[in-house]
């Protein structure tokens, strides 16, 4: 059970064992206290906590998945032989783990797929909220679903509706990182259960990924696409997610797409391990995050400078980045037939695939052209299967 008010973020766990049960309680992010009770006091204590405003989350606590601060080079996995690839895979995981340990109480709390889904549903509810009090009420529920490290919860709440898009973006990023860790653990567990005699494989094999070093031709292509940002190029890797790549190739064939494009996508450092593993995912929150003018889609840029603003690099416009290194990806996107847009209309805020078809039957993407409304072109797709990662690029 958890309570999340403006000044509290407390939990109270009740664990039965025989004719007794143990209570673990405290403020989320601090050390817990323990006390043992006879089983006869279970009902009394439960009702007492419910009356005090605690929320029963036992329904979300089935099929528990512990998210631990692991090490990719433990005995569970075969060592990745290529040092460059082993290093980048470990770095990507470390950045994800740090984001979780900085924001969630993972040392003593467990995360389930049900918790992730509930938090995502609550985040989606925030999209349509205009009242600050209601916004904060839902936000507190999110904090209670997956407990967070907070000294004072009120510091994390919206002061006005001007804070909404920033908070939604931050919460979505954190949840995406957590989701990536849960998906990884589920994948590992399912593979382990299928193998009677465990044969060590690399983490890339387990996750269905392929990494390889870029050759000179790749680097020339990447730098040309970076254009004015090419001086920031540091390193790059060819990346293939077998699942999203197969899905993309099937989409291109089935839809008769004749032209695909390599386009840029930027994101914070801690997000990339999740993005590489799960692909870019359509989320209702995309429509309200600052800079997302064209609704419920996945956003790409032909010019690297545009995507750079969404990374962790110091001075990044949309994220307020402060890192001396950052990552972007060149994604292959099924461009097909575009719906060309040269001026903004408020109807685009609610765009999705159905509205795209209403505006331009047969269109595969919305291409927003630079001009009065934008400094740089943006290309938005409204189906997840329209894209897959091809290159991961590090910038400094």
What spans do the regions from the language model cover?
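Intrinsically disordered, low-complexity terminal and linker regions
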Residues: 1-11, 16-22, 28-35, 40, ...
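N-terminal accessory/precursor segments of enzymes
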Residues: 12, 17-37, 275-296, 324
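ADP-ribosyltransferase catalytic core
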Residues: 47-71, 282-375
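Long, positively charged binding patches that form subdomain-scale interaction surfaces
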Residues: 231-310, 317, 323
């Amino acid at each position: 059970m958890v309570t999340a008010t403006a000044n509290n973020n407390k939990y109270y766990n009740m664990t039965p064992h025989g004719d007794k049960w143990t209570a673990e309680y405290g403020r989320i992010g601090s050390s817990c206290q323990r006390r043992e009770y006879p089983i006869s006091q279970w009902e009394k204590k439960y009702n007492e906590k419910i009356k005090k405003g605690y929320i029963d989350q036992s329904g979300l606590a089935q099929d528990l998945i512990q998210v631990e601060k692991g090490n990719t080079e433990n005995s569970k996995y075969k060592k990745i032989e290529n040092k460059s690839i082993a290093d980048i895979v470990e770095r990507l995981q470390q950045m994800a783990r740090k984001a979780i340990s900085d924001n969630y109480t993972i040392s003593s709390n467990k995360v389930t797929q049900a918790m992730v889904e509930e938090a995502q549903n609550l985040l989606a509810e925030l999209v349509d909220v205009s009242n600050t009090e209601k916004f904060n009420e839902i936000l507190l529920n999110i904090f209670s679903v997956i407990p967070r490290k907070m000294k004072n919860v009120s510091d994390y709440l919206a002061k006005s509706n001007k804070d909404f898009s920033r908070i939604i973006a931050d919460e979505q990023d954190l949840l995406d990182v957590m989701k990536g860790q849960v998906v990884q653990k589920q994948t590992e567990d399912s593979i382990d259960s299928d193998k009677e005699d465990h044969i060590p494989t690399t983490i890339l094999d387990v996750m269905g990924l392929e990494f390889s070093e870029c050759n000179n031709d790749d680097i020339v292509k990447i730098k040309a696409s970076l254009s004015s940002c090419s001086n920031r190029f540091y390193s790059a890797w060819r990346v293939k997610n077998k699942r999203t790549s197969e899905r993309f190739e099937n989409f291109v064939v089935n839809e008769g797409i004749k032209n695909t494009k390599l386009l840029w996508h930027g994101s914070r450092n801690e997000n990339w391990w999740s993005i590489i593993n799960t692909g870019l995912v359509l989320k209702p929150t995309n429509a309200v995050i600052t800079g997302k003018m064209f609704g419920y889609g996945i956003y790409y840029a032909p010019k690297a400078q545009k995507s750079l603003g969404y990374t962790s690099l110091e001075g990044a416009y949309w994220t307020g980045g402060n890192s001396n290194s950052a990552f972007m990806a060149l994604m292959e996107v099924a461009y097909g037939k575009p719906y060309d847009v040269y001026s903004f209309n408020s109807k685009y805020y609610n765009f999705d695939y159905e509205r795209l078809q209403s505006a331009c039957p047969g269109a595969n993407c919305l291409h927003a052209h630079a001009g009065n409304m934008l400094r740089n072109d943006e290309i938005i797709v409204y189906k997840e299967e329209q894209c897959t990662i091809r290159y991961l690029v590090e910038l400094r």
